[in-house]
Amino acid sequence: MKKMILIAGPCVIESKDLIFKVAEQLKNFNENPNIEFYFKSSFDKANRTSINSFRGPGLEEGLKILQSVKDEFGMKILTDIHESNQAAAVSEVADVLQIPAFLCRQTDLLVAAAKTKAKVNIKKGQFLNPSDIKYSVKKVLQTRGIEDEGYEAAQKNGVFVAERGASFGYGNLVVDMRSLVIMREFAPVIFDATHSVQMPGAAGGSSGGKSEFVEPLARAAAAVGIDGFFFETHINPCEALCDGPNMLNLTRLKNCVNTLLEIQNIIKENK
């Protein structure tokens, strides 16, 4: 049976202590034979609403902490890059380089990521027609010398795409489940269940969110039939330094993931 991709971890590296506490609680997913697990956290949140918002420890210290997670827990690592000159250094630690949604069309960034040995996760911009994500995927594939396109070509060459909602007026996002089907023509699809419930700028200088919708939307995405899920999670989301309002509490993640595995099995059995 094909493994379900699961990407999970705190939004940003708040401290090594917190990262290790979260990783300790996520290690069972890493040991699950039905899950392809990636630990996620950011060394720098370069697109915060306010200049006063916490951004993280920065590249050098952040990579040291992520490497320590890899060494201690044997986990694969996913983290995002915001500038082309970060790609090579980050790929020495990260197994997956994530392209932020706002930057999903930035050719230089995509090319820099493609030139590394890492897989590439492209988050679809909140502004983007889902069918247009194929052009971002092609930038990575063609940089890697791959002229073929479509799901199989992307899967074989370590490229996947993530849905994280579409702008719906000011300060709100909605999820069009049709986009999951459309994007899966071009690459394996990850559903970012936590950013999809974000309310950009709604907290006055920072983003709000509706975390009560994380699990229902994840279940709906699983029923569509996709490749994996992305959850930002925290021991205490109310105290998180970034994206707390849309995070899923660690205490809820296990049951949520088990439900998603059950739904995926039903979908596979009935195809």
Swiss-Prot record:
Keywords (A to Z) from UniProt: Cytoplasm, Lipopolysaccharide biosynthesis, Transferase
Q: What is its EC number?
A: 2.5.1.55
- Location within or outside the cell: Cytoplasm
Q: Which residues cross the membrane?
A: none
Q: Please list the GO terms describing molecular function.
A: 3-deoxy-8-phosphooctulonate synthase activity
Primary site of residence? cytoplasm
One GO biological-process annotation of the entry reads:
keto-3-deoxy-D-manno-octulosonic acid biosynthetic process
Q: Name the NCBIfam families on file.
A: KDO8P_synth, PRK05198.1
Q: HAMAP family from the xrefs?
A: KDO8P_synth
- Report the family membership: Belongs to the KdsA family.
**What name does this protein carry?**
2-dehydro-3-deoxyphosphooctonate aldolase
